[in-house]
Amino acid sequence: ELLNLWKESTSNLLKAYNFSDEEIEDLLEKRLELDRRIAAVVLSNEESSEYAKLYHPYAYEDFKKFAPALPLDDFFQAVIGQTPDKVIVDEERFWQAADQFYSEEAWPLFKATLILGVVNLSTSYLTDEIRVLSGAYGRALSGVPEAQDKVKAAYHLAQGPFKQALGLWYAH
């Protein structure tokens, strides 16, 4: 039910951005495929809390084999000025399946995820219709029946960058 709700609310939002039905279906399916891949390999909360079991040292040359498509030598040279001798891996299942994520085949899945992310980044700055559409899924999850009044939403948007300064001023 939640998945259908997410699809519906995201579809409605993308329609407001003039995406075609075909583009919307394609983006949603690619995003969900990436999510399925991630869910299959990422650690559960319980597994993540067992810190002693998260220590998996790999020789750097062995680690590079997990993701041959990544320019790891160039990355490490640029960031730390050398390549490491060892890499400590906590998400071992993820890295063992890294070719599912770091490959030409996986790029369309990432691209769809990036597009959806960019669409959602700007929603509060555009039209009120887009603001309301973008919050539909979150409201459904939290049980809020309707969107915040647009004047109140505008106030929260305007005061957002000054929230900490206003709080300090009020406290003194």
Where do the model's predicted regions map?
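Noncatalytic, helix-rich "gating/capping" subdomain that lines the substrate-entry/channel surface
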Residues: 1-172
